[in-house]
């Protein structure tokens, strides 16, 4: 595939976006991780950019296939361009913002995102036989690299449900496969499976223990798998999906005001802090912002039942998400001040 065969409609750099190459190299060297926050709408995007601008943190705006369908690809492109301008308006002179496709499931989808101005794409062939995953990932890499778009591949399968992505069981990444996969595909980063999981119910109660207060305690992440991968691929950018911590105060608020989230449990933040100091340089967080948004909206609906102006409940939702994002940046991932 040559650049002359296909032409990209919009270049990510024209939108003011950056890819992940330099961002990840700095993160590995600096012992922190870059937040990758999923967004579907304006309030989420405002909250992400406000949090990143105020903390001067590099940030990855993630869009799933479902979010792309929901928000419309053309609007997303202009939202991303607007996000860069908005960040500058907030006083962030040199914003480091990536627009990334999360869980791309086909070459055609990845190509479309590259052509629409995305600066990074993920091709998830982890559900395919190994050789087919290699071939698909390589095809995406060959196309994307012509336009300086970085590519994330995946080895291993996460359990849980997120948009169209679902799996019953974990398949842990096999460290002995990673060198072969990266060398054959040319991918720029690798998502691995070490026990994180999609959704707000990351583990079944029978997989957990309970503490003295009767609260569920999730099984620990498989840091031995991560260490095995790092040993095989020293200094290579590693990605963790399904890394929401499912804040129990948000779950409690949702349930207090009519919700029905049972046994919602996430990844402990201390484990994510530990991962962020390793070669893990991108940590994906989606469910936590959904919980923060829903908690704020439910509280307004319950405490101010006469309210019907969307700004009166989406405003508090935006504020609650921003608070969450800043907490993740400053206290969990360690990325504050890394994009001055």
Question: Residues of each region from the PLM?
Answer:
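Short acidic/histidine-rich active-site segments
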Residues: 242-245, 265, 285-289
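Short catalytic-loop micro-motif centered on adjacent basic/acidic residues
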Residues: 34-38, 99-100, 122, 238-240, ...
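Extended, intrinsically disordered, low-complexity segments
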Residues: 296-340
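Single conserved hydrophobic/aromatic residue that forms the stacking wall/gate
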Residues: 1-11
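Alpha/beta enzyme core
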Residues: 20-29, 42-67, 73-94, 103-237, ...
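Terminal accessory/targeting
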Residues: 30-39, 340
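Shared catalytic-loop signature of beta/alpha-barrel
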Residues: 61, 68-72, 272, 281-299, ...
């Amino acid at each position: 595939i040559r650049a002359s065969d296909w032409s990209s409609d919009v270049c990510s750099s024209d939108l003011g976006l950056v890819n992940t190459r330099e961002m990840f190299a700095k993160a590995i060297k600096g012992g922190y991780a870059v937040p990758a926050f999923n967004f579907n709408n304006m309030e989420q995007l405002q909250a992400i950019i406000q949090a990143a601008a105020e903390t001067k943190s590099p940030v990855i705006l993630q869009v799933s296939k479902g979010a792309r369908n929901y928000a419309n690809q053309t609007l997303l492109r202009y939202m991303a361009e607007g996000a860069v301008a908005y960040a500058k308006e907030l006083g962030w002179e040199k914003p480091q913002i990536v627009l990334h496709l999360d869980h791309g499931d086909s070459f055609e989808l990845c190509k479309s995102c590259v052509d629409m101005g995305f600066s990074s794409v993920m091709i998830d062939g982890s559900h395919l036989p190994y050789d087919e995953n290699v071939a698909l990932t390589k095809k995406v890499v060959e196309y994307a690299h012509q336009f300086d778009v970085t590519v994330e591949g995946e080895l291993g399968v996460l359990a849980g449900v997120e948009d169209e992505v679902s799996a019953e069981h974990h398949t842990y990444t096999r460290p002995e496969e990673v060198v072969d996969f990266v060398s054959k595909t040319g991918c720029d980063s690798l998502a691995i499976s070490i026990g994180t999981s999609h959704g707000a119910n990351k583990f079944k109660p029978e997989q957990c223990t309970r503490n003295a207060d009767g609260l569920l305690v999730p099984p620990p992440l498989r840091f031995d798998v991560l260490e095995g991968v790092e040993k095989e691929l020293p200094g290579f950018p590693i990605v963790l999906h399904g890394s929401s911590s499912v804040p129990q105060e948000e779950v409690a608020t949702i349930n207090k005001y009519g919700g029905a989230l049972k046994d919602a449990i996430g990844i402990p933040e201390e484990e994510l802090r530990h991962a962020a100091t390793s070669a893990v340089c991108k940590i994906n967080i989606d469910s936590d912002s959904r919980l923060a948004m829903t908690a704020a909206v439910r509280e307004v609906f319950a405490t101010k039942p006469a309210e019907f102006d969307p700004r009166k409940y989406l405003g508090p939702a935006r504020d609650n998400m921003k608070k969450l994002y800043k907490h993740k940046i400053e206290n969990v991932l360690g990325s504050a001040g890394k994009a001055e």
